[in-house]
């Protein structure tokens, strides 16, 4: 296990180099889905917290999600359970916060996420831990299309972020032959919604990393690299009205011309305007690209310099 961030003001992300190398090589993760849904320790807090957020003007709605109930390992089935977006709001999203649940009762979200100041295995975690996914998407010319998050976004509003980000829905897992396939399918769906990608365009996504985000209670996330067939200028349409509050616009970088180092310098220059999700995803892409015998350089068409 390793920590990605070495900066004091950056969140911490933990990962396992061996697992990520296996994912980059295309080794699938099988899964076993439970019918028993996850329940938070204090289910009564759900209605109270949702009512508070809606009273604050937050336009939130619930949806079914997929929870990781065991740590991933190459060749081993990952245990999954049904959960929901709202259940994450009273578990993972309380991390680094103290929540006044009611008169006389204060909930320390950090202690619940990390009992005894330790990061629990996913099998022992009492967080909702619904699975997230993010991707960097390149076209045939090596151009990278990034999103600018809108004011309604729950995370990193107004920041430049990755090409697509979201979470795994029940529909993504139905019929999937592996968890990694379900993640890739979810990323394709998010690309259509967030970049305006024509849904008839072929997309190939390779999963390159699995991480857990400490500032969100150890929430699990997969990082991918996507290749679209065509040019963003031709297949990147405008987003629909429902997505506009969440995606304000787009930034396109000529990554093939800039090279990995050039994009890295651009990210450093724009550090105040970019999300941690984008910076960390690029770091994992850089590591996967540099691995001996990596297929990424030829696949995305980007050199180091």
Residue spans for each PLM region:
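Short alpha-helical functional segments enriched in proximate histidine and acidic residues
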Residues: 194
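N-terminal leader/linker segments that precede catalytic domains of diphosphate-processing enzymes
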Residues: 1-189, 197-305
């Amino acid at each position: 296990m390793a920590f990605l961030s070495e900066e004091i003001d950056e969140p911490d992300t933990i990962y396992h180099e061996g697992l990520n190398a296996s994912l980059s090589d295309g080794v699938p993760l099988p899964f076993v889905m439970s019918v028993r849904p996850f329940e938070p320790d204090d289910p009564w807090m759900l209605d109270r917290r949702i009512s508070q957020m809606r009273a604050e003007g937050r336009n939130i709605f619930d949806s079914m999600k997929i929870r990781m109930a065991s740590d991933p390992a190459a060749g081993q089935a990952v245990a999954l359970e049904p959960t929901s977006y709202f259940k994450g709001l009273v578990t993972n999203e309380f991390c680094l916060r103290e929540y006044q649940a009611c008169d006389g009762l204060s909930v320390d979200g950090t202690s619940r996420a990390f009992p005894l100041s330790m990061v629990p295995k996913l099998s022992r975690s009492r967080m909702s831990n619904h699975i997230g996914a993010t991707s960097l998407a390149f076209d045939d010319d090596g151009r990278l299309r990034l999103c600018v998050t809108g004011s309604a976004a729950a995370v990193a509003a107004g920041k430049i972020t990755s090409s697509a980000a979201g979470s795994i829905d029940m529909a993504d897992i139905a019929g999937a032959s592996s968890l990694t396939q379900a993640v890739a399918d979810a990323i394709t769906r998010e690309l259509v919604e967030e970049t305006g990608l024509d849904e008839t365009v072929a997309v190939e996504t390779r999963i390159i990393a699995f991480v857990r985000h400490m500032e969100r209670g150890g929430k699990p996330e997969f990082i991918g690299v996507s290749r679209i067939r065509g040019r963003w200028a031709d297949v990147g349409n405008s987003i629909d009205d429902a997505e506009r509050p969440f995606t304000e616009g787009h930034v396109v970088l000529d990554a093939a011309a800039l090279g990995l180092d050039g994009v890295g310098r651009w990210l450093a220059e724009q550090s105040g305007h970019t999300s941690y999700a984008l910076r960390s995803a690029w770091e994992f892409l850089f590591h996967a690209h540099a691995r001996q015998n990596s297929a990424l350089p030829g696949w995305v068409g980007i050199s180091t310099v």
